[in-house]
Amino acid sequence: MIDAKTAQTQEVMSTSHILTLITPDEPGIAHAVSAGLLDVDGNITENAQFGDPGSELFCLRTVLETPTDDSETVADAVRQRLLDAGHTSPVKLRVRQADARPRVLIMVSKFDHCLVDLLYRWRNGLLPVDIPAVV
């Protein structure tokens, strides 16, 4: 059983990461990703995945906590588990720290309703990105 002090220490020492993956769909991908995250003591806090029958691609987005702040270590563990599982298809895999704010260019049509919504969310902190330009 974990006491409150240990739980608090573990919480402070963890880093939140976001993992995204796109690869040709085949059985065992989610299992390999989960095993790779377990190898780095990762704890999945949020997960969304789907297979797209039209493109035959598997897409996954996972938010996780790990004791390491090195995103490349997390990515390497997942890549290794995919290889161990026999997944040799090309994999587009990205792991970044959750607090890293990506730069996003917003491109809009002449109708501004979507732009207004995006800027509202950004200004209120609901959309954690940096917006250098709107075109």
Regions found by a protein language model. Name each.
Residues 14-15, 127-129:
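Short glycine-enriched loop/turn motifs at secondary-structure junctions
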Residues 58-60, 124-128:
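Acidic/polar active-site rim loop that often engages polyanionic ligands
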Residues 104-114:
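Short, glycine-rich nucleotide/cofactor-binding loops
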Residues 114-124:
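Histidine-anchored nucleotide/phosphate-binding helix
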Residues 130-135:
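Short internal beta-strands
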